[in-house]
């Protein structure tokens, strides 16, 4: 009986851990260039539990994502640390925080960045969650009118420069 009970407890704990964790380690950043303003509008989707863990690790204190007054400054700093944009001239562009939206499973982070000259020749680096997961995949979906390009960043990718399509 004790053996059966311990197997049931082990099974329950295993199922609970499996349900909590997600096998897919992915962030998606939608980046749309606004020609009228000369700014790149960013929408970053991250798994809520991963972001909470990353913000807590980054700040050294627990950052609950359901507390906007704690989430905004921590997420803004995290975004600036893990997403860099350089103009075609090589100048690092400063991100302006626009806000966040929390759902049951994801958090959307919003920001804008000036990008003189547009996407072609701009350089990007995206390192979300690399401090937590060596198999993290970060997708950056770029749009400027009819121009669309998807850049993929894994641990060690470094910077990627946008080139015109041939």
Regions found by a protein language model. Give the residues of each.
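N-terminal soluble domains immediately following signal/targeting peptides that reside
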Residues: 22-166
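Bacterial N-terminal signal peptides that target proteins for export
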Residues: 1-12
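Absolute protein N-terminus
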Residues: 1, 21-22
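Hydrophobic h-region of N-terminal signal peptides that target proteins for export
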Residues: 12-21
């Amino acid at each position: 009986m004790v053996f059966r009970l311990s197997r049931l407890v082990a099974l329950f704990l295993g199922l609970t851990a499996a349900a909590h964790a997600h096998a897919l380690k992915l962030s998606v950043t939608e980046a749309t260039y606004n020609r009228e303003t000369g700014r790149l509008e960013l929408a970053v989707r991250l798994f809520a539990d991963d972001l909470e863990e990353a913000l807590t690790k980054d700040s050294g204190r627990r950052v609950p994502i359901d507390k906007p007054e704690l989430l905004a400054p921590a997420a803004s700093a995290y975004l600036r640390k893990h997403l860099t944009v350089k103009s075609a001239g090589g100048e690092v562009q400063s991100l302006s925080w626009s806000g966040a939206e929390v759902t049951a499973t994801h958090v959307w982070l919003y920001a804008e960045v000036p990008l003189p000259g547009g996407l072609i020749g701009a350089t990007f680096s995206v390192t979300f969650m690399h401090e937590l997961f060596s198999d993290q995949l970060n997708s950056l979906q770029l749009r400027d009118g009819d121009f669309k390009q998807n850049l993929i960043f894994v641990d060690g990718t470094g910077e990627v420069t946008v080139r015109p399509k041939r």
